[in-house]
């Protein structure tokens, strides 16, 4: 007959084995998850309206407006990443230096709303919120989200990735968005007139209820142009291999 102590030990063996296995897994996992990072942080104080340029290689760029007149740029980077900065008057250029080892740099940026913004990236999503200044974005592989904008000009070019725009259109403004491979999802106010040119090669164009008030110069399935509510700012949408979706707000 099994003794009480042996029986008790056998009852606890499965639980003890699980604890040992979990401890071993945790030890093996530590080197993989404990990759060191470095921190970049700088505050800029432009005298007038700033022009901020961010040139990244691999990583996200998040920009949001705040009510201060300073610019705060923060980034978490891999140790091998080198960030350079140049400030000439109100022109500020922050760039990730390219090297054979492509390290990651994730930017978090706060700017005055009227800052002129230029963003360049090879790989990594881009997010801009509540900005009122001109915006230029050029990326190879990024999903771009532009939310709450009130900018006079927007120019976005993406080789691979989706573009989402939700904002206002200014009188005499220019809004150009191009994705070689990706969708364009655009939301603009129903009451704002504009001139539209939408084209795609292998995708589809869906203008929703805008189509009923569009005085069209072209109604081809892959190429639609015309004036909405007598026309106004220029809205140019191009998706070579993707959909174009236009929504009212």
PLM regions with names:
Residues 1-249:
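Intrinsically disordered, low-complexity terminal regions
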């Amino acid at each position: 007959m099994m003794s009480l102590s042996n029986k008790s030990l056998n009852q606890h063996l499965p639980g003890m084995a699980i604890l040992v296995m979990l401890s071993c897994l945790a030890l093996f996992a530590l080197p993989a998850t404990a990759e060191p990072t470095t921190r970049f942080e700088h505050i800029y104080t432009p005298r007038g309206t700033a022009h901020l340029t961010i040139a990244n290689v691999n990583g996200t760029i998040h920009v949001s407006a705040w009510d201060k007149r300073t610019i705060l740029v923060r980034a978490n980077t891999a140790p091998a990443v080198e960030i350079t900065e140049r400030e000439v008057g109100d022109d500020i250029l922050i760039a990730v230096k390219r090297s054979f080892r492509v390290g990651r740099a994730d930017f978090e940026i706060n700017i005055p709303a009227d800052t002129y913004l230029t963003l360049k990236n090879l790989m990594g999503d881009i997010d801009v919120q509540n900005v009122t200044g001109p915006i230029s974005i050029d990326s190879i592989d990024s999903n771009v989200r532009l939310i709450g904008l009130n900018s006079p000009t927007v120019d976005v070019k993406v080789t691979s990735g989706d573009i989402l725009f939700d904002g206002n259109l200014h009188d005499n403004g220019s809004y150009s968005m191009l994705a070689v491979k990706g969708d364009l999802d655009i939301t603009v106010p129903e009451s704002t007139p504009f001139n539209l040119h939408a084209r795609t090669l292998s995708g589809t164009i869906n203008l929703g209820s805008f189509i009923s008030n569009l005085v069209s110069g072209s109604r081809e399935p892959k190429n639609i142009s015309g004036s909405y509510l007598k026309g106004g700012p220029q809205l140019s949408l191009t998706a070579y291999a993707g959909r174009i979706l236009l929504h009212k707000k």
